Amino acid sequence: IFLTAELTLKSDFSLEELKDKFQNTFSNESFIRYQKNVNLVNTSGSNYCDISIHQNSNKKIIVQASLDNLMKGASGNAIECFNLMHNLPYNEGVGSLMPFYL
């Protein structure tokens, strides 16, 4: 899945402020990565969601995201839920799945 969304912000933010907010929000998430540019091939067959932010103006940004809906979606989610049900770290075993592009 490749998403491109244009968003209007309620307040003015610089691109650096937006990147900092993103990294503060998702710094503890194993499978969410900030990328300068998102490329679908980098998430194919993986449990990663890659996100990039580009700025049109102080209040308009473009967010792009890429994920594999089989791994990050159905099968990756099933493994994460199994782990949580059995009191294991949610990312146990998921990080060892090799992406298709390697």
PLM features per residue range, with description:
Residues I1-Q64, M71:
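C-terminal substrate-binding/catalytic lobe of Rossmann-fold NAD(P)-dependent oxidoreductases
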